[in-house]
């Protein structure tokens, strides 16, 4: 409906070489397309469903890019590279910022070592400004924007990657990803 639900938010990947994909990005090309496809889903309540989305492929200097998709009820993005060989990601910047102080359903890690969790927990409902800073949360997190709807913040396709935990960035007024590397260092 043309309404902004998420404030400007940063995203980047830091590689083991020290290079940061997403830092001062320079667009080489942008390609847009509208897609409608049928997806086979043998384990879903229906065996097939249609998905329609608008896609933006930003190719950036440095042989990498960001692929973003906007569906009727959600958006997603992913980094990709056009480089040969393997890359090692040592850190991730993934913010999700909001105007004002909306409330959210947040599952906090309640273990002494935050990354040792079964990802099962009760969700606490509170304004983002009341985010418990002495611990981290895990995904998904559901942000309540009142009559404007909800924003669900989650990750997908996590294989051979430790996943992301969340903390609250008071200055940016939103969630900031905390990687396994940061948690392990403390």
Regions from the language model: what does each represent?
Residues 49-100:
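Acidic, contiguous internal or C-terminal segments within carbohydrate-active enzymes
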Residues 96-99, 103, 110-165:
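Extended, low-hydrophobicity, Ser/Thr/Pro/Gly-biased non-transmembrane segments
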Residues 1, 65-69, 152-153:
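Broad, structure-driven detector of short, well-ordered beta-strand segments within folded domains
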Residues 9-14, 69-75, 112, 155-160:
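A short, sequence-level motif marking secondary-structure junctions
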Residues 2-60, 103-108:
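A low-complexity, Ser/Thr/Gly/Pro-enriched, surface-exposed linker/loop concept
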Residues 37-51, 66-70, 121-135:
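Short linear motifs in intrinsically disordered
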Residues 181-186:
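Conserved small/polar residues in nucleotide/adenosyl-binding loops
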């Amino acid at each position: 409906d043309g309404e902004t639900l998420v404030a400007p938010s940063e995203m980047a990947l830091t590689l083991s070489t020290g290079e940061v994909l997403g830092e001062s990005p320079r667009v080489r090309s942008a390609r847009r397309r509208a897609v409608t496809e049928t997806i086979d889903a043998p384990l879903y309540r229906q065996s097939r469903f249609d998905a329609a989305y608008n896609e933006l492929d930003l190719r950036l200097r440095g042989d990498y890019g960001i692929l973003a998709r906007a569906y009727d009820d959600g958006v997603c993005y992913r980094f990709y590279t056009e480089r040969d060989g393997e890359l090692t990601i040592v850190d991730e910047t993934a913010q999700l910022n909001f105007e004002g102080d909306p409330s959210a359903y947040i599952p906090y890690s309640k273990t002494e070592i935050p990354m040792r969790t079964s990802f099962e927990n009760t969700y606490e409902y509170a304004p983002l400004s009341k985010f418990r800073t002495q611990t981290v949360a895990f995904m998904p997190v559901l942000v309540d924007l009142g009559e404007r709807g909800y924003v669900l913040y989650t990750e997908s396709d996590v294989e051979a990657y430790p996943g992301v935990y969340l903390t609250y960035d008071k200055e940016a007024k939103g969630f900031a990803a905390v990687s396994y590397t940061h948690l392990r260092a403390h």
